[in-house]
Amino acid sequence: MTEYKLVVVGAGGVGKSALTIQLIQNHFVDEYDPTIEDSYRKQVVIDGETCLLDILDTAGQEEYSAMRDQYMRTGEGFLCVFAINNSKSFADINLYREQIKRVKDSDDVPMVLVGNKCDLPTRTVDTKQAHELAKSYGIPFIETSAKTRQGVEDAFYTLVREIRQYRLKKLNSSDDGTQGCMGSPCVLM
């Protein structure tokens, strides 16, 4: 069974835990209890493949920012979550993305931009803005509601598909026969 290490990042109060718990346990948590770090595992079938999702739900609060480098190192893909009624959380996405790229030492890291709380009538982040940001990053954008479950599976499953594409790309680039021992082609004798 293939395992995927997913990390949910974003500012405090955007609904990272609510999204994760909705996916794992099929229910909505409406009381806010700031997370330090929680880990969840769930077996799912995505596009016919049985997968084990290892999901790390992270702290949005600034006082836990020192822990970020560690989980960014181990994560394979990132759900970058903002709340559609919180412009600051949307602006913060760039900070998370830059930190992920720095820690991973790569511009090419599987990510999905997630606009949560789309069930709320008070929107301060326009869908068009979010689509444009995602397009500029070259990543998918999905609107979700942890309350109604809208887009929840789609967000996590899309991230798994992004990780699959990334793994294939890595496999193909290292499997083209040109790079062998010490950077030169290997010769079998």
From Swiss-Prot:
Membrane-topology annotation of the record = Lipid-anchor
GO CC entries: Golgi membrane; membrane; plasma membrane
Q: Annotated motif Effector region: location in the chain?
A: 32-40
List the InterPro entries hit by this protein, alphabetically: P-loop_NTPase, Small_GTP-bd, Small_GTPase, Small_GTPase_Ras-type
Lipid-bearing positions (S-palmitoyl cysteine)? 181
Lipidation (S-farnesyl cysteine) occurs at 186
Modification after translation, per record: Palmitoylated by the ZDHHC9-GOLGA7 complex. Depalmitoylated by ABHD17A, ABHD17B and ABHD17C. A continuous cycle of de- and re-palmitoylation regulates rapid exchange between plasma membrane and Golgi.
Residue sites binding GTP per the record? 10-18, 29-30, 57-61, 116-119
A GO molecular function for this record?
protein-containing complex binding
Q: Describe the family membership recorded for this protein in Swiss-Prot or TrEMBL.
A: Belongs to the small GTPase superfamily. Ras family.
> Could you identify this protein by its name?
GTPase NRas
Which organism does this sequence originate in?
Answer: Mus musculus
Classification from the root reads: Eukaryota, Metazoa, Chordata, Craniata, Vertebrata
Q: Which gene encodes it?
A: Nras
